[in-house]
């Protein structure tokens, strides 16, 4: 029997069977926890860990590498420290911190890791794009000048401090001056674009706020029909400092998902003061050297690399496709002409704009809207100090009709304020001065706008034309806003084509004559 078995056949059978064995062994690079405290862990043994890499603890908690030292790695925890003990095993994921994004996120409230926190179940992330949290800003050749307006629906902003798509415009002021209100009104105003099939996707990033405040804001957006095109990224005061630090980066990554696919997007960071405080906390626990006001030396770089990611991308498809630092998943899906507009918010203490973080962000952004407590308390809302508010993009981010009508409004209002200061000391004044003061006061009343009631740009141009050209001379100061409402109601019913023409950026003699005729009828009823 044995003489029938050939050794070559045995070896052949063994080789065939060995080929079928799946070698499923996988080696994970692991380390052990040395110390853990205040949301930071030090880990020994991860010699090949990279900066910003995700690590996974054996209990499922995730962390991000921040410090690379000779004998250990310092990482910030994206969860609670309870359950993490000395000696616990930590493994590398070999993935840089990122967030998975797709259109199913619209209308949802998520945390900086992309997990839903609104109680509506998990988000379907099938075919989602993996967008890195930290990414280089597009280079100069991949950008184009900001030239398209981002309508906020606020007369004071759209006429005097215009914001363009791709711009970074800082909203700065003390607490309780209406900073968030401006950002929320801007988001609500994008509803008409969404309904017209030209959506501006909005991302609202809440950093270090009370969970109840975020819930109220989400409810407000729902009531005004703004949630279908909005994503809320929430890192509340109860979340670890690392989550508050990374929340704006998650917002920017989601914004880039829309921007790189050719859509306009708007991201609101509310507010970066709290992000800087969270970053300071994490840095001090990691024993990084501190600088001015105990902030780490690279706090300027923290905000500059975040805000530089806002851009208007080149229209040329072949140029946009070559964009630097493009995530692998985005290749083949890039479309030129997209934009990411940033509205960072900074809270000042007692109106001090010369503090460390405010001056940093002012120098990074393309202008600022400065809100004042005094104006707010006097009833001028939005409480914008036009004198020191500025948009460095200017008229190139306005439609032609608005530019023509409101081009001198900012200077006129500044002159009015100077004259008003002098008029307090003077008993008699000439007719020109009296007229300038009257027009300035009435324009101030026109620029007052209730919260959550953004105005379409065509209507803005029409009413500002009346204010700038002194068509409301006969109207008493306390009846200006009542007159405005009557004028707009009549214009909508009797000459809707005027509003459409102005919204399209055109203004001609026929249009202005209709505006003057309608206002003359309304103003005539106020003659004493």
Predicted regions and their residues:
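Conserved catalytic/coupling modules of large nucleotide/cofactor-utilizing molecular machines
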Residues: 274, 281-528
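Flexible beta-alpha connector loops of hexameric P-loop NTPases
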Residues: 144-150, 175, 202-207, 230-247, ...
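Acidic-enriched and Gly/Ser
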Residues: 2-17, 23-26, 32-150
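P-loop NTPase nucleotide-binding/switch module
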Residues: 88-90, 97, 101-104, 117-167, ...
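Loop/turn-to-beta-strand initiation segments
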Residues: 199-201, 228-231, 262-266, 337-342
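Phosphate-binding/switch loop-helix module in NTP-utilizing enzymes
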Residues: 243-279, 331-332
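Conserved P-loop
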Residues: 180-228, 253, 260
């Amino acid at each position: 029997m044995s003489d029938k078995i050939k050794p070559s056949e045995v070896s052949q059978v063994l080789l065939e069977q060995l080929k079928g064995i799946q070698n499923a062994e996988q080696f994970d690079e692991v380390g052990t926890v040395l110390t853990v405290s205040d949301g930071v862990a030090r880990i020994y043994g991860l010699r090949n860990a990279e900066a910003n890499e995700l690590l996974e603890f054996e209990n499922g908690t995730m962390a991000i590498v921040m410090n690379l030292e000779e004998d250990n790695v310092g990482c910030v925890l994206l969860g609670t420290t309870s359950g993490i003990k000395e000696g616990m095993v930590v493994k590398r994921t070999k993935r840089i911190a990122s967030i998975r994004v797709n259109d199913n996120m619209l209308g949802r409230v998520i945390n900086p890791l992309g997990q839903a926190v609104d109680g509506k179940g998990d988000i379907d992330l099938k075919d989602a794009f993996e967008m890195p949290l930290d990414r280089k800003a597009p280079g100069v050749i991949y950008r184009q000048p900001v030239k398209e307006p981002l309508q906020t629906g606020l007369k004071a902003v759209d006429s005097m401090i215009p914001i363009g798509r791709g711009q970074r415009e800082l909203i700065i002021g003390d607490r309780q001056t209406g900073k968030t209100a401006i950002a929320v009104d801007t988001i609500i105003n994008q509803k008409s674009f969404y309904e017209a099939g030209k959506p501006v996707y909005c991302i609202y990033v809440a950093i270090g706020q009370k969970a109840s405040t975020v819930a109220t804001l989400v409810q407000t957006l729902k009531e005004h029909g703004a949630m279908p095109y909005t994503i809320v990224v929430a890192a509340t005061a109860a979340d670890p400092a690392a989550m508050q630090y990374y929340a704006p980066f998650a917002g920017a990554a989601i914004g880039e998902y829309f921007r790189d696919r050719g859509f306009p997007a708007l991201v609101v960071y509310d507010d970066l003061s709290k992000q800087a405080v969270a970053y300071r906390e994490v840095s001090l626990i990691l024993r990084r050297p501190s600088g001015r006001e105990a902030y780490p030396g690279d706090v300027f770089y923290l905000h500059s690399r975040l805000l530089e990611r806002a851009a208007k991308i080149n229209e040329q498809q072949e140029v946009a496709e070559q964009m630097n630092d493009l995530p692998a998943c985005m290749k083949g899906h890039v479309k030129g002409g997209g934009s990411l507009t940033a509205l960072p918010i900074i809270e000042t203490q007692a109106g001090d704009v010369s503090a460390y973080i405010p001056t940093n962000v002012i120098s990074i952004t393309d202008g600022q809207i400065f809100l004042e407590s005094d104006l707010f308390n006097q009833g001028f809302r939005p409480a914008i100090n036009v004198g020191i508010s500025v948009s460095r993009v200017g008229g190139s981010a306005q439609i032609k009709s608005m530019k023509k009508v409101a081009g001198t409004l900012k200077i006129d209002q500044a002159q009015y304020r100077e004259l008003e200061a002098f008029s307090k000391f003077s008993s008699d004044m000439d007719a020109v001065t009296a007229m300038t003061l009257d027009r300035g006061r009435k324009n101030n009343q026109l620029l007052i706008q209730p919260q959550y009631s953004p105005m379409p740009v065509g209507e803005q141009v029409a009413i500002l034309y009346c204010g700038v050209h002194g068509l409301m001379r006969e109207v008493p100061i306390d009846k200006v806003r009542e007159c405005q409402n009557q004028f707009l109601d009549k214009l909508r019913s009797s000459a809707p084509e005027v509003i459409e023409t102005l919204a399209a950026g055109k203004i001609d003699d026929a249009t202005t004559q209709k505006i003057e005729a309608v206002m003359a009828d309304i103003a005539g009823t106020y003659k004493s």
